[in-house]
Amino acid sequence: MVFLSRPGHTFYGVIILKAYHRNINWTGFVPDAQGRERLISTLCLLHPSVSRQVLGKSLCGRSIDLLQLGAGDDPVLLCGAFHGMEWLTSLLLLRFTAQMAAALETGALISEIKLGDFLRRRGVMVIPCVNPDGVEISIHGSAAAGECRELVHNASRGDASRWQANARGVDLNHNFNAGWEALHALEQQQGIHCPAPTRYGGEYPESEPESRLLCDFCRSQYFRHALAFHSQGEEIYWDFGEHTPEKSRLMAQVMAASSGYKMSEPEALATGGGFKDWFISYLHRPAFTIEIGKGKNPLPLSDLPNIHQTLEEMLVFSVIM
């Protein structure tokens, strides 16, 4: 428990939390809403350079958090956990946020780069978990879907451990308005006609509060570029149609060279409908999908340290490019 003293007296809670933070076991807890809340609260208390706001709510009323640090000009947007089983991406982003905050506050180097100097001129915004309902369902089962629990139970045939969609059975990364009609036709051809654990794109683009919230935010706020983190495959997707900026290829090459990940093109049922696709198509600015790690979703917590080490330099470059 953290005890806070009266105004004007020593803030003993910070001392306790600093001792805790030095030894945070990023792989030693359940990565659900409660665990994520504990990490975010700790980060914001320890690091005054990190500000937090609730960007909006999911279908089930769970908070979708936004973390900001650095100068407010020309920010980069980093988003994770679009899919229920891909919660490791949210932990990766929180861990990198802690690194960025330390770099800004203490001058610490990240991959031998003084990222703090850059953050004093430009900013970063992080949405660790775009799909909090999906994450909760994949970890705790259909009961976590609230009023949608019967839908989830039926669509998952009683086993929601491989749930990727939101609580309404809509795959958020098929719900953005970029090639949505063509993707919807492909879904129909594959027999995907209704809410499902994955790959059902909804009745129309931005039908879901989570995808609509993210689009509204990007329409209201200028971002230099955006990165959407998924798992798995160790791949970087960087283009979408005629509006892909010329510099996107070079940026992807830099990220690939620094991480060892390969530049790829998506398969048919992963073409269009995604956040990266919409960002490029609608805003005409660079956006990337980063498929972290390798294996079978959900990737284990024990993979996080190696994934973070592999991607650290790439993450730094993604912020400063």
Roles of regions detected by a PLM:
Residues 75-77, 288:
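Conserved beta-strand elements of the Class I
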